[in-house]
Amino acid sequence: AQHAKKMRRFYERLVGRQVSFPDVAYDSQRLAVSNSLSSEFQVLAQAVNRLSERDRRSRDFTLGSIRRALREVVACFPIYRTYVDAGRGTAADVAAVDAAIAEARRRNPAMETSIFAFLRTVLLPPAGADDTRLKVAQRFQQYTAPVQAKGVEDTAFYRYHVLTSLNEVGGDPAHFGRSVEHFHAANR
């Protein structure tokens, strides 16, 4: 871990540009959404759009704006999937959704922020949410796993080679090594 900066600088000189794994993963996940998994994405976006039309606060969002915001949230999703049900989600699930939305907002400052607030209510359905809203949330949860697999494992891992041994399923090429304490804590 102590030589991570040196290796990154060497890699950047080798490829001729500054590159970070989170950016490569983001671009690769956007590619997966737009190409390999686009039909599933269109079905999901249509379902989210139908939800938006049911509420006066969100009915002015166009299908196009929902697609753009949803694509960004999916591309920024930090984990394979969440397991959220109406009003019930672990702190980790809520944190993953909030992190994805925050990163999507950061990467797209010109996008209307209220659409991200609406998407949060879709992805984290409140207690008492109706079956339609729950099904849309579940569809999103089922969609993010193949996007992660296709975007990160099958694409980003083949585009980012600072230290190839980090590019394994379950690995994170952005992090070089762990402390002994972290290793023992993970094995408890």
Report the location of each language-model feature.
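Alpha-amylase-like alpha-glycosidases and glucanotransferases acting on alpha-linked glucans and related
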Residues: A1-G89, V94-R188
